Amino acid sequence: MDKLADLNYTLSVITLMNDTLHSIIQDPGMAYFPYIASVLTVLFTLHKASIPTMKIALKTSKCSYKVIKHCIVTIINTLLKLAGYKEQVTNKDEIEQQMDRIVKEMRRQLEMIDKLTTREIEQVELLKSIHDNLTTKPVDVIDMSKEFNQKNIKTLDEWVSGKNPYEPSEVTASM
């Protein structure tokens, strides 16, 4: 385990790989050498990083299948990114989480639409009642049967006949 974290050991392995590649491929003008070296470096790094991580994860976790699946998906996604692909591999758990998030957001939006619709209906009903209260209704005949103080009211005919209904008929003075 100490050798896995040792930087000198890692650098010596990379140097050994490069020396081996140089000895195998004698032609210095070979065009594919940097690509091969890059792929081998990435594979070596993945090997050195994933083996101890998976050992620790398997010892500490209760569900080793999910850990292994997650590590493999991560390695495949890393290789796809290095190859230049934009697509990624996802496991069912991530898809289910995304679907749950989408369904939750849709429910939230439906509740908001329901609240807004209810408020709009209430506003329309309020505007209708305000409109009904503000509209004037034409009245042909005024019903005077509910009026008070009708005993002293003179009609228009008495006024026309020359008698003023507002003049007192008797004048009394106190002494």
Swiss-Prot record:
SUPFAM superfamilies: Rotavirus nonstructural proteins (SSF58030). Residues 1-28 are lumenal. Residues 52-175 are cytoplasmic. It is found in: Host rough endoplasmic reticulum membrane; Host membrane, Host caveola; Secreted. Pfam families: Rota_NSP4. It comes from the Viruses. The N-glycosyl content is primarily Man(9)GlcNAc, with a small amount of Man(8)GlcNAc. Binds 1 calcium ion per tetramer. Homotetramer. Interacts with the immature particle in the viroplasm. Interacts with host CAV1, early and late in infection. Interacts with host integrin ITGA1/ITGB1 heterodimer. Interacts with host integrin ITGA2/ITGB1 heterodimer. Interaction with microtubules blocks trafficking to the Golgi apparatus. This is Non-structural glycoprotein 4.
